[in-house]
């Protein structure tokens, strides 16, 4: 693009475009969240987006729900550890959240290590992932304490403030509008990923859109 200034100086400017801002709240333990996050990673390859990865916690969400089945409550105990570590990483090494989520999520979901039960169940995997992405393994110390719980709750509440407190993970904000989901059972690739994202952005821009839903009829695939 050519601009003629008032002093008759001619300059060439390339037309600039704004990146689409995406905020993605995740709990690494959730397999559906994992598939959605891998879709966003595919979108990064074909669209100009800027993603902020923010931890939330199914353990926080389900606090006080004593009516839940015992095995599910045991899973929520296990999920505290990784969520706390992500809160510490977000607060102190925010540029590493993406890499840690990719590494630990791959170990848990693609490595068929999910669904663990009881406090501390994920600590060995967390330690491996911290080392793999160049983070201090000492960050694992927060997994078994309440040291960062206030910070974790604040990150989690950031998602709830956008969509309400009766949804799980993921919560995805496209610009100023946030939704729970989308829930996918496969990871869209290439231009398919981009086209689905374009549709989501269009829905997000319509101020009176709230929900689309249907029952799931197939299981998850991560590859």
Residue positions per predicted region:
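Local sequence-structure signature of Cys/Sec-based thiol-disulfide redox active-site neighborhoods
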Residues: 18-39
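Solvent-exposed beta-strand sheet faces enriched in polar/charged residues
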Residues: 23-25, 54, 173
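Structural alpha/beta surface segment adjacent to cysteine/selenocysteine redox centers
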Residues: 34-129, 199-203, 211-214, 220-223
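Short, Lys/Arg-enriched N-terminal segments with co-localized hydrophobic residues
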Residues: 3-17
């Amino acid at each position: 693009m050519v601009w003629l200034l008032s002093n008759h100086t001619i300059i060439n400017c390339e037309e600039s475009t704004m990146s689409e801002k995406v905020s993605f709240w995740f709990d690494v333990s959730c397999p559906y969240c994992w598939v959605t996050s891998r879709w966003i990673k595919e979108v990064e390859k074909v669209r100009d987006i800027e993603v902020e990865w923010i931890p939330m916690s199914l353990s926080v969400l389900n606090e006080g729900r004593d009516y839940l089945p015992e095995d599910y409550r045991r899973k929520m105990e296990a999920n505290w550890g990784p969520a706390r570590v992500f809160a510490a990483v977000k607060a102190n090494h925010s540029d590493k959240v993406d890499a840690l989520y990719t590494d630990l999520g791959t170990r848990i979901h693609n490595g068929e290590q999910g669904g663990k039960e009881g406090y501390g169940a994920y600590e060995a995997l967390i330690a491996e992932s911290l080392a793999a992405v160049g983070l201090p393994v000492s960050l694992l110390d927060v997994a078994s304490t309440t040291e960062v719980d206030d910070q974790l709750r604040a990150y989690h509440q950031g998602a709830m403030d956008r969509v309400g407190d009766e949804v799980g993970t993921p919560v995805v904000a496209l610009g100023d509008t946030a939704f729970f989901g989308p829930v996918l059972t496969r990871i869209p690739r290439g231009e398919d990923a981009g086209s689905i994202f374009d549709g989501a952005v269009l829905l997000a821009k319509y101020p009176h859109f709230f929900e689309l839903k249907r029952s799931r009829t197939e299981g998850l695939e991560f590859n």
